[in-house]
Amino acid sequence: MKSLVTVFSLAVLGLSACDVTHPVAVVGPSNTVYRGSATATFLEGGWFQVNNGANTCRGQYNPATDSGMVTFPVRCTNGLTGVGKATYDNPRSGGGEIVMRDGTRWKFIFGRQALAV
């Protein structure tokens, strides 16, 4: 029994250290494309960062709810801030929208489909 507990504990520790990184594309005003990546950590949520050369935007999120949705604050180096909402289509991809405080709506895409933007 003790060895079973040890094996289970090691498996949980191994999984908790797994970070998975996915490509991200964000399409802002005038079809300005930001590219970057999102990193998800098992049971801890994750973070993303994108840039378009002149501006960088980033956000951090908690694990998805049962609905597969995450909500996250966004902050950009040009001073813009907003709130994003994204839904997982599957464990490796999905998308949603970021609504900035200035009222603009930005498209948020992560996973393989972000590579096509």
Residue map of PLM features:
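N-terminal Sec signal peptide cleavage junction
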Residues: L15-C18
